[in-house]
């Protein structure tokens, strides 16, 4: 199937699943308004790639089907993410007394600062979700943002929110595959990605595309999901944690940190910063919202978010969604989605506590001033 045909089919399926009025409803209300048969199909499309197998053949199948797997994943989980987490789908560090919303915004501000984003810059957000980070970074810096996403539902929601918050003049969101970007070479002043390029079947492929569209002298900053130096691919317990993260987060394969670092260098980037922000002695761990440990709750404003994302809250949501599904209020397959997300939470907490996994490996890389875009190399890397 050609890229054009795939995009048309995905757009048509999104309309069947979500309807035409996307944006006004969020969370569980959006879930309840989905087309039942289309939701069932979306869940089946996603789960067929995760059948409990962790062998090389199963891994290769997921890597080959990354585009459809990622599109299907966000069709089924976006409403749950907004319900439990908000419009910025990423983790962050927490400081004593800091609210959840403040920590999320600070994490985004820090990336923008490290990337050197300035007022008037044209910036690419790779894997933009529903536009939460793009809106925050645009407000924080005064830059102009283009958000790239392969999920039609999220693009429609991102555009709706940009209009709602009077930011449409500062940003736009486009459909595309980050392994085959449609932008002209040397287009963007800066590029960033927040916990998104982990969906790539090959990091060198997406990084080479970013290198291609970034102007010479421009900066790319990313929070990457990787397995750390403590991870052993041959350790069954380690592999189980990685698989739980892959299953629940729509990731074809979790790569080791060295793979990411080498991929950046192989694409021609000068790596300026390589730092695991999760490797610290913070009193409050980055994964605390998933743990169910109430001692970490900072203030009353955090209680609602923490309850929804904690173990107890997730069990409550699963039970509620199961009842709603039986009553016909939620589309069939919804409870399977909550089960997959529960697997992800278990894996993320286990990976965080053991420091086998980090969701915030910060890389800041620069495209040399005298760089000539290696178009042929870029094409080879995506294959």
UniProtKB/Swiss-Prot annotation:
Keyword Cytoplasm tagged:
no
Q: Sites of the modification Phosphoserine? A: 99
The biological processes this protein is annotated with in GO are: ergosterol biosynthetic process; methylation
Q: Which family does it belong to?
A: Belongs to the class I-like SAM-binding methyltransferase superfamily. Erg6/SMT family.
Against PROSITE patterns, the record matches this protein to: SAM_MT_ERG6_SMT
* MF-aspect GO terms: identical protein binding; sterol 24-C-methyltransferase activity
Known catalysed reaction(s)? zymosterol + S-adenosyl-L-methionine = fecosterol + S-adenosyl-L-homocysteine + H(+)
Give the knockout phenotype. Answer: Abolishes the production of ergosterol.
Q: Which organism is it from?
A: Saccharomyces cerevisiae (strain ATCC 204508 / S288c) (Baker's yeast)
Please name the CDD domains in this protein's record: AdoMet_MTases (cd02440)
What is the primary gene name for this protein? ERG6
Q: Name one GO cellular component term.
A: mitochondrion
The EC class name is transferase
Q: Pathway, according to UniProt?
A: Steroid metabolism; ergosterol biosynthesis; ergosterol from zymosterol: step 1/5
So which domain of life are we looking at?
Eukaryota
Q: Summarize subunit and interaction data from the UniProt record for this chain.
A: Interacts with ERG28.
**What Pfam families does this protein's entry cite?**
Methyltransf_11, Sterol_MT_C
Supply the name of the protein.
Sterol 24-C-methyltransferase ERG6
Q: What keyword terms does UniProt attach to this protein?
A: Acetylation, Endoplasmic reticulum, Lipid biosynthesis, Lipid metabolism, Methyltransferase, Microsome, Mitochondrion, Phosphoprotein, S-adenosyl-L-methionine, Steroid biosynthesis, Steroid metabolism, Sterol biosynthesis, Sterol metabolism, Transferase
